[in-house]
Amino acid sequence: MQSQIVCHGCRNILLYPRGAPSVCCAVCHAVSSTAPSPGMDIAHLICGGCRTLLMYTRNATSVRCSCCDTVNLVRPVSSIAHLNCGQCQTVLMYPYGAPSVKCAICNFITNTGMNTMRHLPPNGTSYTAPSTSAPTTQSQNVTVVVENPMTVDAKGKLVSNVVVGVTTGGKK
């Protein structure tokens, strides 16, 4: 099984066998460590230009893709909001400012009014919706990711609209 890392010297993508402690770039001969430095919190995002998975440190504000040179803005935690689906009450996650969210479970479109929105806590912990139903003996959380149609922002660029829903699997 192989993994990928970006060369610290020339920014090329390097393939290496999983488990290797470091990899030497064939282009610039720089040695890159495959393990993140201690204390570094690593996050991932998908490049808006070429859809490549990018890895970056959490304190970054933007990430340049080494494949297509697109500069991807990193969305701060405070720009992600939650609301309950207007039909099945599944908790949905959406980018702050979106006018509506389509539920991946029941396909209901919920308007994102200020009275239904919940911000993600700033420490990065996940949101847990309070339960209004009787406790179940064995519930299993299911996470559903839906990519809604792309929209155009004020600068004329395409913007991805990704929705994440979490359900206990009780309602369909």
From Swiss-Prot:
Chief location: nucleus
Record organism: Oryza sativa subsp. japonica
Its job: Putative zinc finger that may be involved in programmed cell death and defense response.
Assigned keywords, A-Z: Nucleus
Superkingdom of origin: Eukaryota
Location of region: Putative zinc finger 1: 4-34
GO cellular component: nucleus
InterPro entries, per database record: LSD1-like, Znf_LSD1
Annotated protein name in UniProt: Protein LOL2
Location(s), subcellular: Nucleus
Annotated spans, Putative zinc finger 2: 44-74
UniProt-annotated stretches for the region Putative zinc finger 3: 82-112
